[in-house]
Amino acid sequence: MVKIDLITGFLGSGKTTFIKSLCESLGVINTMSSPTYSIVNEYNTNFKYKIFHFDLYRLTSEQELFELGFEDYILSNNYVFIEWPDLAIPYLDSYLRIIINTENNNRYLRAEIIKSS
């Protein structure tokens, strides 16, 4: 099962709203907010796992990514949702990429499962 989801789309396309809905369906019990300034939010669930929600928009280097302890998060066997994932992609073996496009006030989602060889 792929537990790392990358959510891409333009500013304002609904990435955070989509992730909040995913978190609710996965049993998140605490209040959710955008990690735009905190970079990563941690959520507890009604189950044994946690959810880590990253927003990498403000990061400018791989060094910043690893100073956050990124490797520990992706190896934790918990759910990891990442907005603006470009810096993270080279370090992921497999993931689900969800692309959000908007057109005429509608949102269109496309999902791709990516596995490294």
What does each model-found stretch correspond to?
Residues 10:
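P-loop (Walker A) phosphate-binding loop of NTP-binding proteins
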Residues 7:
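Hydrophobic anchor at the beta1->P-loop junction of P-loop NTPases
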Residues 51-59:
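Switch II (G3) loop of P-loop NTPases
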Residues 24-27, 63-65, 72-117:
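Short phosphate-coordinating micro-motif centered on Lys-Gly-acidic
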Residues 14:
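Conserved glycine(s) of the Walker
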Residues 28-43:
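Short beta-strand-centered segment that lines the nucleotide-binding/catalytic pocket of NTP-utilizing
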Residues 1-4:
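Pre-Walker A (Motif I) flank of P-loop NTPase domains
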